[in-house]
């Protein structure tokens, strides 16, 4: 019926992935967004241990906690590998999952010694944005006046719409996304702290928006 359904699982994802493998349930798309850039201080929790037990172990027995994390990363990788063999597309979110899995001795490298799976920057965001020069572009209203930010939103929208009218087909979708983002930013209260914006813009967009602000 084309209804979008989101289900939150409260637990350790490794237990869930292993159960999916056990029950032969195929998954189309997978990733990991744990904070594995900080694996030893709560960025990644081992399976088979409660949250309370794990937090105590971090303080009282950090070496054992590291061992448990590494064991879980091996299990995690094995489950991902099995699901990918059945057709799942897995990508790294840029959170050091591939790196820490390899350090833990998991089966995460191919025959050439490279990671088996791509990062989302390399495989998804690259072809969509970065390969065409799109990247984070920020501006801040030093007045901290919401009305000034509204003016910059209006100017940015006008500039992007003008650019989009002559843009090649390859970037029209990104340009349209940027316009929708700016138009909806105020309504969705995207400001945290200073009156500022962030936008994925290419070189032409950055220059023309900045010039329009100054004019």
List the predicted regions and their residue ranges.
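Long, well-ordered, tryptophan-enriched scaffold segments
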Residues: 38-43, 47-48
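Phosphate/diphosphate-binding loops
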Residues: 1-37, 55-90, 94-169
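Terminal or standalone catalytic/regulatory effector modules within metabolic enzymes
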Residues: 133-215
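Domain-level detector for long C-terminal conserved domains
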Residues: 48-49, 68
